[in-house]
Amino acid sequence: MSAEQLRAVLAAARRGAKESFGVDVEFTQPEEQPLKALFDRATPDERSDWSDLSYDFKRGKGDRKRLARGYAAAFRSDENSLDDQIAFAEPYLLAPVREKTYDGFAEAVTATLIARLDQLKSQKLSDGGELLDGSPSNEVLYWALIGKLSFPYDVVITNQLIASAEYVGSSVHTAIRGGITNGITTGNPFSPRGVTAIVSTYPVTGEDGVTRALRGGESYSEADSARYAGLLLVHEIGHQLYDLGHAYGKNACVMNPPAMLRFREWAERLSPADCRPR
């Protein structure tokens, strides 16, 4: 995104935070940071630990059963019911839920996750480079554990695709997209608030075939891309400032994650006045 688009993202986030949470949010002047230099701060021990927790889809050497167990555990601990999680995910699964248990649901989600990750790893960037290369920049854990890297920012906006699978499990809406993460909110003792909200703009702007298909075949204008990225930041601010969970199925609420990457449909259904408790 250009500097002008980034300003539009932050303006959309300010408006959205006011509408959804009644809070006035201000952002400092953005600073650009090289991603490689940031992740190079990880120690060899940290890299080894994070690698052990990650499913190695790039080399096809992951433990699928362990992955499914991790997702079953994550779904059990989710504040949403099993029925609500299944209802949210089922239209987008590539494998059937053979039994409506946490284990049965996790099997279907894991099959979908792996299939879509396999599709993603064959995609190219517009310059012909690999969408997912040998670096760890796409790995969720490197972002989720950014607080270990002496990173003093409350908000991060990146154009890097974040897509991976971890044995510790993740939310269902991320898994069914092939591990694509729109955003992460994570503890960070080096940031002013002690929590960093991270948004990836790649799901909104990326033009590889898989990402575009997950958007329903759409490519967005610069103005729409900035608006949708701003709303994704509002979603993360809900996690960051208010510790809000995911409001699966509550289409009026910004805390209901986008289905797949269909950001236009998601944004058009938002109605903060209809979301607030009465």
Q: What kind of region is each of these model predictions?
A:
Residues 17-21, 147-149, 190-191, 247:
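A generic structural signal for short, solvent-exposed coil/turn residues
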Residues 22, 30, 34, 152, ...:
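Proline-rich intrinsically disordered, low-complexity coils
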Residues 7-28, 32:
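Domain-scale, conserved, charged regions that form catalytic cores
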Residues 1-4:
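Short beta-strand segments enriched in small/hydrophobic residues
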Residues 15, 19, 143, 257:
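Charged/polar, solvent-exposed surface patches and flexible loops
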Residues 30-231, 240:
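Metzincin-family zinc-dependent endopeptidase catalytic domain
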Residues 22-24, 195, 251-252:
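A generic structural signal for alpha->beta connector loops
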